[in-house]
Regions:
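Regulatory and interdomain segments flanking nucleotide-handling catalytic cores
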Residues: 1-192
Length: 192
């Protein structure tokens, strides 16, 4: 497990600021900071149109504001999960459960999930999908010496954009959002 004592400073993502490296000094919870974050999220949500892209826009707003806030403020717990990651994974699980119950034409979610909780744990509500594009290294590194660095960057960028497009198309086809994207990088991804 994670037994480190490092903490991130509580701040919102800001490309103009330095990288928020973990520090050994414990971070004090600040009520004023939390109010500022809530106000920022509220202001950002006012500008988001409620349509099929809403969830992805909301996800971006939450990522910008909650990445460096711990999901637990209890002094008895290790605060090593960000509030953003907690919210994102919770939304991914909820969307899987909702899709499964809708496919089963289940109307009474409370009965299925709470009153018959033990049985619901046995249901196949989740699928972990892994994708890997083979041959990426060959594509990236099959380049001549002249302008090699520029060529490597261009090919790497091309693959990243292609992968993001494939992921977005796949998520759209199965009626999921980017909340269900657990990881993407190096020509691979994990989706729940």
């Amino acid at each position: 497990g994670n037994h480190g004592k490092s903490h991130y400073a509580m701040q919102v993502l800001n490309p103009k600021e330095d990288i928020n490296y973990p520090m050994e000094t414990p971070v004090a919870m600040n009520e004023h900071f939390y109010k500022t974050v809530v106000d920022q999220i509220t202001d950002n949500l006012l500008g988001i149109k409620l349509d099929e892209e809403y969830v992805n826009s909301l996800l971006s707003v939450l990522e910008a504001n909650l990445t460096y806030i711990p999901s637990s403020t209890s002094k008895r717990e290790l605060a090593d999960i960000s509030l953003f990651d907690h919210v994102k994974i919770t939304a991914a699980v909820a969307s899987c459960v909702e899709q499964y119950l809708a496919a089963q034409k289940e109307k009474n979610y409370r009965e299925v999930l709470f009153e018959n909780a033990k049985e619901s744990y046995e249901k196949p509500m989740f699928l972990l999908y892994s994708m890997d594009i083979s041959g990426i290294q060959n594509f990236i590194y099959s380049i001549g010496d002249k302008g090699a660095l520029k060529g490597l960057r261009a090919r790497s960028f091309y693959l990243e954009i292609m992968m993001e497009h494939i992921i977005d198309e796949l998520l759209e086809k199965v009626s999921l959002s980017r909340t269900n994207l657990i990881y993407t990088g190096g020509g691979g991804c994990l989706i729940v």
